[in-house]
Amino acid sequence: MAFPTSSAQQAETNRKILEEIQTKKQLLIGLGSTTNQMPAPQLLGQPTVTAEFTQGVSVAPNAAGGIAAPRSAFNPTSSTTLGFFIPQDSYFGNSFIPVLPRLEPVPTSSAPNVK
């Protein structure tokens, strides 16, 4: 018999793999419960500046060779719009994405009912 314990070794390997998967699953469940919490919705017209955004705003050189802070564009825009912004990291210098609400079109009345 060349390999008398192949099924026992396979069972042991499978058990170790299942244990590893179970521990990773428990870690993900533990981490997921804290990261999946959605923030409270903001009222339209209120700026949404998070701590992560203000810390994550980087200073990027502009085309003229000077330094332009994205925050200088973010503050006036966020205070005058009906939407809100999602902070992001971008290679193109876009530090936030605007999210505008979808408004339903105003129904237009057709020809008046004549009897």
Curated annotation (Swiss-Prot):
It comes from the Eukaryota. Belongs to the SOSS-C family. PANTHER family: SOSS COMPLEX SUBUNIT C (PTHR31526:SF2). One of its GO terms (cellular component) is nucleoplasm. One of its GO terms (biological process) is DNA repair. This is SOSS complex subunit C homolog. Pfam families: SOSSC.
